[in-house]
């Protein structure tokens, strides 16, 4: 049978419905979002919170967000660019940084709602699978659901590092261990040692040691920040352990100290301002006069 080109007729175009803008741009999965924000119809003024985890090339962003009719509201926010304050100055987008950012947003959110003292979470993580349980004669744990956006949920993904950090920070996040690093799909068991290694940056230390032996030039390039600070692979675990303790001591947000007015002026210096109608007329008249002289 010969190929017949599909002709899009007038009825096709008259019935065509465009998708939502953020769906067309590939930014929002509305199928998942609908199910994440759907609230029980017998609950009133009880927001359904979600842990939103997003990644850029250099940083990790974690937020506790609830949805209302007039938009999303952010309860707590944490960014991995805040981690140097706690001693983590390198690799701000890796698995361990995602864990630390999740821990930070969890402690910050619990402090805001007054549950930080009642739900401390896992103070010394050893890689075991634990869910936050309700305490007797007290308020229930703060419950959130993981929102991964368009991120692929592969086993060992960094998004689950952020979830593990938030869970160890005291939030109740319904989940199972089958997407953590070290989960064996055949035995359906979690290797605690492997997960602990990722929490304390052991996988980074192993990679550093491998590059030292196999490719010195690439090691010098990839870990230049650690080399400049005199940090070796066997020191990473202590650095991350101290950072987690500092996050628990003071999870509050601190401003960077930059002059906002100066920063705005610097950024606007390279932005071309849109001309007003009067300015456009003046420019046009000036060009006409200049052309007449020529």
Swiss-Prot record:
Entry's Gene Ontology BP terms: cytoplasmic translation; ribosomal large subunit assembly
Localization: Cytoplasm; Nucleus
Pfam families (alphabetical): Ribosomal_L18_c (PF14204), Ribosomal_L5e (PF17144)
Gene3D superfamilies: 3.30.420.100
SUPFAM superfamilies the record matches: Translational machinery components (SSF53137)
Annotated coiled-coil segments of the chain: none
Gene Ontology cellular-component terms listed: cytosol; cytosolic large ribosomal subunit; nucleus
Main location: cytoplasm
Keywords: Cytoplasm, Nucleus, Ribonucleoprotein, Ribosomal protein, RNA-binding, rRNA-binding
Keyword Ribonucleoprotein (UniProt): yes
GO molecular function: 5S rRNA binding; structural constituent of ribosome
Record has Ribosomal protein as a keyword: yes
Positions of disulphide bridges: none
Family named by the database record: Belongs to the universal ribosomal protein uL18 family.
Its biological purpose: Component of the ribosome, a large ribonucleoprotein complex responsible for the synthesis of proteins in the cell. The small ribosomal subunit (SSU) binds messenger RNAs (mRNAs) and translates the encoded message by selecting cognate aminoacyl-transfer RNA (tRNA) molecules. The large subunit (LSU) contains the ribosomal catalytic site termed the peptidyl transferase center (PTC), which catalyzes the formation of peptide bonds, thereby polymerizing the amino acids delivered by tRNAs into a polypeptide chain.
Extra facts: There are 2 genes for uL18 in S.pombe.
Binding partners and assembly: Component of the large ribosomal subunit (LSU). Mature yeast ribosomes consist of a small (40S) and a large (60S) subunit. The 40S small subunit contains 1 molecule of ribosomal RNA (18S rRNA) and 33 different proteins (encoded by 57 genes). The large 60S subunit contains 3 rRNA molecules (25S, 5.8S and 5S rRNA) and 46 different proteins (encoded by 81 genes). Component of a hexameric 5S RNP precursor complex, composed of 5S RNA, rrs1, rpf2, rpl5a/rpl5b, rpl11a/rpl11b and syo1; this complex acts as a precursor for ribosome assembly.
The protein, known as: Large ribosomal subunit protein uL18B
Organism: Schizosaccharomyces pombe (strain 972 / ATCC 24843) (Fission yeast)
């Amino acid at each position: 049978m010969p190929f017949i080109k599909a002709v899009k007729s007038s009825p096709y175009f008259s019935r065509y419905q465009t998708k939502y803008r953020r769906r067309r741009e590939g930014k929002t999965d509305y199928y998942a979002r609908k199910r994440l924000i759907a609230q029980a119809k017998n609950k009133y003024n009880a927001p359904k919170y979600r842990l939103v985890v997003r990644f850029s090339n250099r940083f990790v962003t974690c937020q506790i967000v609830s949805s209302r009719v007039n938009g999303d509201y952010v309860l707590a926010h944490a960014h991995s660019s805040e981690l140097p304050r706690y001693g983590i100055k390198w690799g701000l987008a890796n698995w361990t940084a995602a864990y630390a950012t999740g821990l930070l947003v969890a402690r910050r959110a619990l402090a805001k709602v007054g549950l930080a003292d009642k739900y401390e979470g896992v103070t010394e993580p050893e890689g075991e699978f634990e869910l936050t349980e309700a305490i007797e004669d007290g308020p229930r744990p703060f419950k959130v659901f993981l929102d991964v956006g368009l991120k692929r949920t592969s086993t060992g993904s960094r998004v689950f590092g952020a979830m593990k950090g938030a869970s160890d920070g005291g939030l109740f996040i319904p989940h199972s261990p089958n997407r953590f690093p070290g989960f064996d799909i055949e035995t359906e068991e979690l290797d605690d040692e492997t997960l602990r290694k990722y929490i304390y940056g052991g996988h980074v230390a192993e990679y550093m040691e491998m590059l030292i032996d196999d490719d010195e030039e690439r090691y010098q390039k990839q870990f230049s920040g650690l080399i400049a600070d005199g940090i070796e692979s066997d020191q990473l675990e202590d650095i991350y352990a101290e950072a987690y303790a500092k996050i628990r001591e003071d999870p509050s947000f601190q401003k960077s100290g930059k002059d906002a007015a100066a920063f705005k002026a610097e950024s606007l210096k390279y932005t071309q301002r849109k001309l007003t109608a009067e300015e456009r007329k003046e420019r046009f008249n000036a060009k006409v006069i200049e052309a007449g002289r020529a």
